[in-house]
Amino acid sequence: MSTSRAPETTSAAPLSAEQSASLYRLMTWLSPAFPVGAFSYSSGLEWAVEAGDVIDAPSLRDWLTAMLEHGAGFCDGVFLAHAYRAVAAADETALRHVAELATAFVPSAERHLETTAQGKAFIEIVRNAWPSDGLACAVDACAGALAYPVAVGLVSATHGVPLAATLHAFLHAVVSNWISAGARLVPLGQTDSQRVLAALEPAVIAAGDRAREASLDDLGSATFRADLASLRHETQYTRLFRS
C-alpha cells in the first residue's frame, strides 16, 4: 500500500477565523432547528397537493423549480440581497424601501403571515443570542414588519457574513422546508425527498446567483398557480399547515 500523500491544494487550506464564524452562524441561523416556525408553513403547497398539482417526487420537483426560478424563491433572494446592501451602505432610506416592498409583494394574507412571523422570530432570536451593535439601528430603520428574507439579509450584513454564502444558504433552507412539507403531504419517503433536494441543487445555485445581480426592477412572478394555491389554502377545509 502506498503511503505517499496527495499534494495539498487550496481547497484543503483551513478556513480563517472570520470564515469559520460566518459558516457557523449560517448553519445555525438557517438550520431546521432554528426556531422561526418554518415547519408550520407550506407556501400553498398543501392546496397544490389537494388539487392534484403535486402528486409525487417529480411533480414536487417541477413545482419547486418553478417557484425558485420564477416565483417566491428568486424574489426573496432579491429582497435579501438589497436589504444586505442597504445595511452595508448604511442607507436607511433604501432599507426601508426594500422592507416595505418585500411585505407588499406577497400574494396572500397567509403568505404575509408566513414571511413576517418568521422575520420577527428570526430577528428576536438573533438579537438575544448574537447581539450586534448595528442590528437594533437597522431594525428600527425599517419601521414596520420585516419579511423573512429582509431579516436574514439585515442580520447577515450587520454580522459581516458574505452575501453570496447567505443567499445560497437561505435558498437551500427555504427549499428544504418546502420539500419537508411536501414529504408530509404527498407523502414521500426520506430517500425520495433527498432526491428532490439533490435535483434542485442547480436551480438553487442559479437562483442565488441571479438574485445577487438583480435590480428591484427585475422583480416579478410568473407562478400564477402557486400564488393561487396560497390564496385558496385560506379556505381549505382540512389543513396541516398555516399557509
UniProtKB/Swiss-Prot annotation:
Q: What is its main location?
A: cytoplasm
Q: Which Gene3D superfamilies match?
A: Urease accessory protein UreF
- Residue ranges annotated as coiled coil are none
Q: What InterPro entries does the record point to?
A: UreF, UreF_sf
| Keyword Ion transport annotated | no
Q: Taxonomically, which superkingdom?
A: Bacteria
One example GO MF annotation: nickel cation binding
Q: Which Pfam families would you find in this protein's record?
A: UreF
GO cellular component terms attached to this protein's record: cytoplasm
Give the subcellular location.
Cytoplasm
* Keywords, comma-separated and alphabetical: Chaperone, Cytoplasm, Nickel insertion
Its quaternary structure? UreD, UreF and UreG form a complex that acts as a GTP-hydrolysis-dependent molecular chaperone, activating the urease apoprotein by helping to assemble the nickel containing metallocenter of UreC. The UreE protein probably delivers the nickel.
The family line of this record is: Belongs to the UreF family.
The entry's function note states:
Required for maturation of urease via the functional incorporation of the urease nickel metallocenter.
What's the protein name? Urease accessory protein UreF
